[in-house]
Amino acid sequence: MRLRPTLLLGAALLTLVTTVAACGGSDSGGSSSAAFDPKNCQGGTLTVLNESGLAKFDPATLYTSGGGALPSLVYRTLTTRKRVAGEAGTTPVPDLATDLGTPSDDAKTWKYTLKDGLKFDDGTPIGSKDVKYGIQRSFSPDLPGGAPYLHDWLIGGADYKGPYNGGDLESIETPDNRTIIFKLRQPHGDFPYLATATQFAPVPKAKDTGTKYQNAPVSSGPYKVEKYEQGKKLILTRNTHWSRAVDDQRLACPDRIEVTSGLEPTVINQRLVSGSGADAKAITTDANVGPEQLARLGSDPSLSKRVSRGVFGETKYLAFDTTKKPFDDVRVRQAVAYAINRQSVINAVGGSSLASPATTFLPEGKAFGQQRYDYFPAGETGDPAKARELLKQAGYAGGLAVELAFPNYDGDGYGPKVAAAVQDALKQAGITVKPKSLSEEDYRTVTGKPATQPPLSLQSWGADWPAGGPFLIPIFDGRQILKEGGNYNLAQLNDPAVNKEIDEINKITDAAQAAPRWGALDAEIGKQALLVPLYHPKTVALFGKGVKNAYVDEWRGWYDVASVSVK
């Protein structure tokens, strides 16, 4: 699972402020009449103002493209997201590799060939063994936190503990210095998407310093780390051994990028609005505009020109534990679905500029294959009468009381404010909600363990890559249920037909063919009312008046820092 940076990686329809340039960006600078020229965009210092991030910067411990777009400025991977605005930006493209990989054996084997001329920031060549070593170290217990897919997908991955004790993962083969082959336990047509994860970044074994590596990593991207203060500061300068001749996806316009983390969103937005000093050439990769700025957008044309809008493939929802009463009865689950007032939920998170109502689990967009459905139509404000009718059929004519768990922090978009909106809506239907607020630190631990999981909880799911698989598999595949903790299949669904369809879709290596199958599966599962979709978040982000080509990409739902330039 990937969470939004400020909310906790996606694709859906994107609205850009300005016209997309041929290079794949947009002249979003607003205050300049000069068009953005990707051939002449070098120079200057870009400032990045963030709320979160920078807690980790080791490619092994980052979760997919965690930390926004920043890691991909230092770490190249076998594949990467296509660096363009719009729907085309939801597809993977080759990065270190010459292509998206050659599948065989029903997508259980994937072969990649590295490009010529690849170099680390010290000038040494990058080879297939460097990529393998980078992947292997991500299995080390000393470097936790990365995406779990390789542990599950690679043969022997579940028991492998990394290379520090001399072990070798035999399911990754390097027959020569440019070839790397992956042997998987089961078919996975999405492997080219997974190969964008930072775990696929090459690491030279001779320069691996273990847990200290993030302080001075060896770069394969356009920038190298000059300074890293965990959780606070990151300064990037040019890697002189990188060039666009070997990397056609990263424009890498600024000479220097200075990132500050740990700022309050209100402070970030105030600094971006005022744009004094270095803040004139600043962006954020995790702070949506606040109420004050939203109110000004309609009346302040100059500010409106410095906003980009988009979405991240994410759904906020109510989760049922269908093994616990009263939610073992589908009529009770349906009653909750009818009772929900989505308009009040959207108002709680800032209004329609920042959220759109959801009746499907999959977000909008061709990449996900969403098929529109609304099996329990309640309109914008809910249907408490229909909910009461269903409760009566289920034997709860006098209503019932339920506990609702939620994190005690509103920044992720499913905290106390949303819980209050849900509580009020259910009250209208005769359902009394007992709020159960948990700390951010405890929330995933409690809700992710079946033995401690509350019957009803607020949850969020975001796309690790823009496709239906990483949305549906963790939530609905019965073989993904983890009794000891870390479980995301909160409904505890274990339907052989669903599991079989997941396996069949996983064999498909053409994303365009797989997408409608994922959409159809979502539509079929939705009939069981295993969860109640609430809303899909939107991004509305400011950028400084001296920033150009700041567009929100459709993979992660934030600015693509690799494409931004400063005046």
Where are these regions (language model features)?
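Detector for C-terminal structural segments
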Residues: 14, 229, 339-370, 414-423, ...
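Surface-exposed binding/hinge segments that line
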Residues: 113, 130-132, 143-204, 227-229
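N-terminal lobe/hinge region of extracytoplasmic solute-binding protein
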Residues: 49-105, 218
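Structural transition elements
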Residues: 223, 353-393, 410-417
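Ligand/substrate-recognition segments at binding pockets and active sites
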Residues: 392-464
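Aromatic- and charge-enriched surface segment that lines or borders ligand/interaction sites
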Residues: 99-149, 181, 271-274, 326
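Extracellular/periplasmic solute-recognition and catalytic clefts
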Residues: 145-148, 152-154, 226-237, 258-324, ...
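Gly/Pro-rich hinge or "lid" segments in bacterial periplasmic/extracellular proteins
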Residues: 83-87, 187-252, 256-258
